[in-house]
């Protein structure tokens, strides 16, 4: 510690209960200007202890409207997450061969994330099966880890596809390297995100940044992010008929797919880059420090 440090305001940004506790203890032990900020992302009502901890914070923020709705009081501000728009770029901005080129001769409906029912993969498969049968040049690509406890779930999904005679059009890639994800997003003709519940949901931002048309469920931050019919489509979680209708609309209209993809990319550049997230956080830090 130095005299200069004693006059500085230190921001402690907590994201979990244990971090709020650490910050409160630190504030008592270290005699410096410490301001504590908490980000609430949980989409559930907090325990009494957590609510008490939040009441001791200098500021509480959230990442989306859905998470904010569970707080006992309105957060000071909403600061959504962002993505690296240089990493997740549209096809037109990428030169050279992609790792996903083996998929390029067909059209693909993709869904990303660890394979389990919570992600709405069963909804997607049931919605897509008749469309795959009617469009043999389209595939369903499920990108994500299959843990041992989910193997039976996957077997049931494959049996469902086999019963509709489209098993060869349903691909489970398994867990993919992090570096392969940008090219996999670009390889998709349509990206879906159909979670029944979601904390925030970066997958949608990554797909939109990649210039892909997105169908997302009304979960996590997705209703905040997507302007339906302008830069993506929104469906209710678990709504098979609605999801099938949205898929059919995009399968049948290439121009609409391209329109949504272009608008999606612009939405990310305007509002959801990681640089913009950092700028908003720094601005909020400065506002807290000045009070």
PLM regions and their residue ranges:
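Conserved acidic donor-binding segment of nucleotide-sugar-dependent glycosyltransferases
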Residues: 228-229, 233-240, 249-255
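Short alpha-helical donor nucleotide-sugar binding micro-motif in glycosyltransferases
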Residues: 175-176, 183-188
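A conserved, positively charged/aromatic
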Residues: 32-58
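Short hydrophobic beta-strand element within catalytic cores of glycosyltransferases
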Residues: 213-217, 226
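Conserved donor-binding/catalytic core segment of Leloir-type glycosyltransferases
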Residues: 99-119, 125-129, 141
């Amino acid at each position: 510690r130095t005299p200069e440090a004693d006059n500085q305001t230190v921001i402690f940004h907590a994201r979990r209960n244990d971090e709020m506790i650490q910050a409160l203890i630190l504030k008592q032990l270290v005699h410096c200007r410490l301001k504590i900020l908490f980000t609430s992302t949980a989409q559930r009502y907090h325990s009494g202890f957590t609510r008490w901890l939040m009441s001791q914070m200098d500021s509480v923020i959230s990442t989306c409207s859905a998470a904010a709705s569970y707080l006992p009081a309105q957060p000071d501000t909403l600061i959504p997450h962002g993505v690296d728009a240089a990493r997740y770029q549209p096809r037109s901005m990428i030169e050279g061969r992609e790792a996903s080129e083996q998929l390029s001769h067909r059209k693909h409906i993709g869904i990303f994330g660890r394979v389990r029912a919570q992600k709405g993969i069963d909804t997607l498969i049931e919605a897509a099966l008749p469309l795959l049968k009617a469009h043999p040049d389209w595939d369903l690509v499920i990108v994500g880890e299959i843990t041992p406890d989910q193997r039976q779930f996957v077997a049931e999904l494959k049996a469902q596809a086999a019963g509709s005679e489209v098993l060869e059009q349903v691909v489970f890639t398994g867990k993919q390297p992090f570096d392969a994800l940008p090219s996999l997003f670009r390889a998709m003709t349509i990206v879906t995100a159909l979670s029944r519940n979601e904390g925030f949901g970066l997958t949608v931002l990554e797909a939109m940044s990649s210039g892909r048309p997105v169908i997302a469920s009304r979960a996590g931050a997705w209703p905040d992010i997507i302007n339906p019919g302008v830069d993506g489509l929104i469906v209710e979680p678990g709504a098979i008929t609605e999801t099938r209708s949205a898929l059919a609309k995009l399968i049948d209209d290439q121009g609409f797919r391209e329109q949504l993809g272009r608008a999606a990319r612009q939405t990310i550049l305007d509002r959801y880059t990681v640089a913009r997230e950092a700028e908003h956080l720094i601005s909020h830090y400065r506002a807290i420090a000045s009070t």
